[in-house]
A protein has these predicted regions:
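Non-heme Fe(II)/2-oxoglutarate
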Residues: 1-93
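Catalytic core of non-heme Fe(II) oxygenases with the double-stranded beta-helix
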Residues: 87-198
């Protein structure tokens, strides 16, 4: 896994080749098994419009933390999240904040033709996203956009990802094609007394 810390236009970490080849293949097998069980927005957690209360997303998802606590995808992702990642981040204050996270919630989402997630914020301190799909890329659109930062855009390439502050407004425009999966980890520090050094 390769990690690159960027300070502009806001502090974030770009991730490449997140899973090894063997891990990626195991992830794809697990995705195929989970796919029929993914739920619509009303049942899979979603940010909602402040005035109407309607879901801001149109995709399918499942919280793996509750539904599949022994998920291989989650186990593989955790293997790369701390020592391997922070050894590549040359920013002590960011590293300190990242290490303090002691609570994780994992979600798997699927975006297919016409699906999207309107601009919203997350309740997490950090949000980690990893994109997965089988090559060749079976869709267009669906990149990650930060509208408050001049539409700063992160392409959702296979086996890549990003870590950013959850309260930053972000969105996913509609996808055209058969789509992709997103593995999301919402992290936070629930109890500072429980913080361990990783």
């Amino acid at each position: 896994m390769k990690a690159k810390f960027l300070i502009e236009p806001f502090p974030h970490v770009l991730l490449e080749d997140y899973f090894t080849k063997g891990e990626w293949e195991a992830c794809i097998r697990e995705l195929r098994k989970l796919d029929p069980h993914l739920l619509p927005p009303e049942f899979s957690g979603t940010a909602r419009h402040k005035e109407t209360g309607r879901p801001l997303k149109f995709n399918s998802g499942l919280f793996l933390t509750e539904a599949m606590p022994n998920s291989e995808i989650v186990q593989f992702a955790r293997n790369h999240m701390y020592q391997e990642l922070v050894s590549q981040v040359d920013c002590s204050w960011w590293e300190s904040q990242w290490r303090q996270n002691n609570s994780q919630s994992w979600m798997l989402s699927r975006y297919i033709d016409g699906q999207y997630y309107n601009a919203h914020v997350d309740l997490s301190q950090f949000t980690l996203l990893i994109w997965l799909y089988q090559e060749p890329k079976p869709f267009t659109g669906g990149d990650l956009i930060f509208p408050d930062y001049n539409n700063y855009t992160i392409p959702c390439n296979n086996n890549t990802g990003i870590i950013f502050y959850g309260p930053l407004r972000h969105e996913v425009p509609p996808i055209k094609g058969s789509g992709r999966y997103t593995l999301t980890c919402f992290t936070s520090c629930q109890n500072p007394a429980l913080v361990s050094t990783r």
